[in-house]
From Swiss-Prot:
Primary subcellular site in the record, as a coarse category: secreted
Organism: Ophiophagus hannah
Keywords: Cardiotoxin, Disulfide bond, G-protein coupled receptor impairing toxin, Secreted, Signal, Toxin
Miscellaneous field: Negative results: does not affect blood coagulation and does not show significant hemolytic activity.
Identification of the protein by name: Beta-cardiotoxin CTX15
Tissue-by-tissue expression: Expressed by the venom gland.
Intrachain S-S bonds: C24-C43, C36-C61, C65-C76, C77-C82
CDD domains membership: TFP_snake_toxin
Length: 84
């Protein structure tokens, strides 16, 4: 019984991830993400328009969300892997 209880406690701690860590995508692939450093608690997706039909997309972690402009669309969010 004690072994079962101990196992449940360990599984709970691992699943809850007691340390605060935001996880943000850094590629278009949903399985590839990075754990954000302390202080960067938002995910960002920036779409930069280079030519009429060519775009660069940057994904990652950020502390303060910048504003969008005519050539840059910015999406910030504050849940794990929300910057798809």
């Amino acid at each position: 019984m004690k072994t079962l209880l101990l196992t449940l406690v360990v599984v709970t701690i691992v699943c809850l991830d007691l340390g605060y860590t935001r996880k943000c995508l850094n590629t278009p692939l949903p399985l590839i993400y990075k754990t954000c450093p302390i202080g960067q608690d938002k995910c960002i997706k920036m779409t930069i328009k280079k030519l009429p039909s060519k775009y660069d997309v940057i994904r990652g972690c950020i502390d303060i969300c910048p504003k969008s402009s005519a050539d840059v669309e910015v999406l910030c969010c504050d849940t794990n892997k929300c910057n798809k």
